[in-house]
Amino acid sequence: MVKKVLLCFMLGVATISSGCGKQVSSEKSNVVDMLESDDSEVKDTFPDTYNAESESGKVKFNCTLELPENMNTRTIQKTTVEGVHSYDKDKAYSLLAEGKEISNKEQYDGDNGEIISYTFSDGASLYLDYNITWTSATSSLYAYLGVQQSDYIDLFSSDSVSLDKDKYISEIKKDMNELGYDTENLSFQAIPLSVDAMKKLRDQELNNGLLEKGKTNEPTSEDEAYFIYAYQENTGIPVFHELMSVAKQMSNDSPDNAPVQAIYSARGLESLTIDYIYNFKNEQNTVTLKPFDEIASVVEEKYDNILNDVNYEVTRAKLYERVYTGEDQKYAEEPIWYFEVMENGSNKTVMLVNAETGKEINLPS
């Protein structure tokens, strides 16, 4: 049972923050005790924030719910997954590698058609399957440093670069549109990769033995870049793509799990990966999601019943549309709540709950 539940509904223009515990700006705020309120309008919506504590004190919620901005009801559109979006391989080659000297080319049949792999004389490479992977001749520095790893987000996000982020995002959108992707359904973000931050990371990895001396040169001003990434959205809800359901350690909502990832420097496009972008079809019916307090009780019960001395704090709650392969080996989808839970304020775990049925989704270890 929840001992105390405060549901904060924001009146006026509100902006959804990107994580739990962060303030949501508004013109006015009302606090509603949902345990005492029987207002049908309140029950048909989701709270902006959720703060609760179990009777034992073992489990606490401190969340700003991450929802589509225009979502004002618990009813959503039912959709089906038609498959992974296809693109023109010849167009991709022309766009990314036209004029380059090919040093090696391999072609073979794959599960989703022909696979073509190119290596170019300048060190660049292009891999074309159902996905696209491009790396330039100067991209090795970023790969060796692992700048896209989620562990380094704080290091890079706290710095800045003298580059035009919006220009680079527009360039990537333009390229993707030419390949036939609908970028209107992609939510783009960018993280600056400054020289100082890359030098600091390089020194750390050298000192920790994670990087061989002489493997990479010291970053220079020419290496300044943006790490740009995007998640797909369907009816405004972000898509939890199939790779994120392969195993628990793959389920994090982080930049390095995004289906679109690119590094853009003043030299141009350093790397690009486009993967797991789906075609969806709207159905005639809708789906009604469970009230959030019922979903929260599933999370509370799980962690409250663990026999240990650990305290758990739920710091993120984000609505996703999960795409996965069903028992019939066909694509399926379901609305889910993605929770990040901190153990004693340090170790993070992820819990997924079906937003329609309230059942936990257990991923392989």
Where are these regions (language model features)?
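Positively charged n-region of N-terminal signal peptides that target proteins for export
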Residues: M1-V5, L11
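A short, surface-exposed interaction/processing loop segment used at functional sites
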Residues: I132-F156, S160, P255-T288, M351-S365
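A cross-kingdom marker for long, charged
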Residues: T325-S365
